[in-house]
Amino acid sequence: MSSNPDLKGSSFTLSVLHLSDDQVENAVSFLQEKVNQAPTFFAAAPVVINISKVAGDIDFLQLKEGISQAGMIPVGVAGCSDKRMQNLAKEAGFAVMTASKSPSQAPAKMAPIKVVRTPIRSGQQVYAKDGDLLILSHVSAGAEVIADGSIHIHGTLRGRAIAGASGQTEAKIICNDLQAELVSIAGNYWLSDQIESEYWQKKTMFSMANDVLHVDVLAI
């Protein structure tokens, strides 16, 4: 059996910081605020910078340093078609990333649903790889539940729920009592302060439509 390294292509869900201008200080302050709100979710997480809406020059060295000081790991720049800007980004240590034009691969075969009957306590993490996650109890504040598919919680969601972890935008999050610290589908997330009060402590379903996260109250 060969013991040589092997280089293969793969796909990952990464957070993307979309800049609207060249004001690096504002971008770093925004990112720091998000990290402070959910440090367990964002700390040491990789982030890509999308600069497609930026008209002026960007101080990439300052941007990279600021992102690192905020607690995240800057890995690349997207939305950059200008060769000079690409070179500046590369000189600062960013990878220049482009959207893939190849057809998407067929989704992997889903695993059987993972069922958890006990409460998920603070500090615990449960992950359903290649499948859905069903929790028949509560998810405490400080706990994290993750699934490559959908997440169904029959109790109260007080912690973090991350569905579609490997990029499935059709994933859903359903909970009987919404009090979440964070909900995320395919890398699109809301923190607790982004959830309107009309949905709080209600039976709800989160889904994606047109690359935007939506929430609905369930009447059943």
From Swiss-Prot:
Keyword Cell cycle: yes
UniProt keyword Cell cycle, yes or no: yes
Keyword line: Cell cycle, Cell division, Septation
InterPro entries assigned to the protein according to its UniProt record, in alphabetical order: CAP/MinC_C, MinC, MinC_C_sf, MinC_N, Septum_form_inhib_MinC_C
Alphabetical list of Pfam families matching this protein: MinC_C (PF03775), MinC_N (PF05209)
One example of a Gene Ontology biological process annotation: regulation of cell division
Signal peptide: none
Role this protein plays: Cell division inhibitor that blocks the formation of polar Z ring septums. Rapidly oscillates between the poles of the cell to destabilize FtsZ filaments that have formed before they mature into polar Z rings. Prevents FtsZ polymerization.
Subunit structure: Interacts with MinD and FtsZ.
Similarity annotation: Belongs to the MinC family.
Protein name: Probable septum site-determining protein MinC
Species of provenance: Vibrio atlanticus (strain LGP32)
Record gene name: minC
